[in-house]
């Protein structure tokens, strides 16, 4: 076997094998369950001492054994967990985004009015869409076109942008949480499916 030729391959092994660890970045709920992985974690690898490998492999090849185990050290990755949840206070007409237990944003909103009061309870963000018509089908007594940045949390109740009024702080909707369009987009981008939503007075 060509030991010098093998040595050239050995000299390039570290460049192919060595890699730094990539830390994981995840969004979790208040129970610690992952609802969104932003970055997958990956262990790091470092090739061990390569001195003598070429000679040892050449000797093995002479015995018709072409399998050679390399010594590789692994470095574990770390995981950064960010907890997110949403609180809707119908008494104060506010929606607050919490990140790691701290207030991230607070918005003045308009919830459901009269017989269409927003339901209280504990929910999770489900289906999301950048724009849709609301109502506009039999069974609904209203039709609002091109409603932006919709994040549903309880059936047909959700957060969305509002262009047809600016009366935030007063219940105005058919059950949804009306927000300014920039605020609704910020919530849409921040709150992944599975994010907890608490609605209360």
Region locations from a protein language model:
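Short glycine/threonine-rich beta-strand-turn micro-motifs
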Residues: 1-85, 92
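Exported/periplasmic cell-wall-interacting domains
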Residues: 7, 117-122, 129-201
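Solvent-exposed coil/turn segments that connect beta secondary-structure elements
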Residues: 11, 22, 29-33, 39-43, ...
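A short, compositionally biased
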Residues: 20-22, 88-93, 145-146, 191-193
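Soluble periplasmic/extracytoplasmic beta-strand elements of cell-envelope proteins
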Residues: 27, 85-87, 96, 108, ...
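Short, mixed charged/polar active-site loops
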Residues: 34-35, 103-106, 120
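A short local loop/turn or secondary-structure capping micro-motif enriched for an aromatic residue
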Residues: 44-47, 105-106, 113-116, 133-134, ...
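A structural motif detector for short, solvent-exposed N-terminal "entry" segments of globular domains
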Residues: 76-113
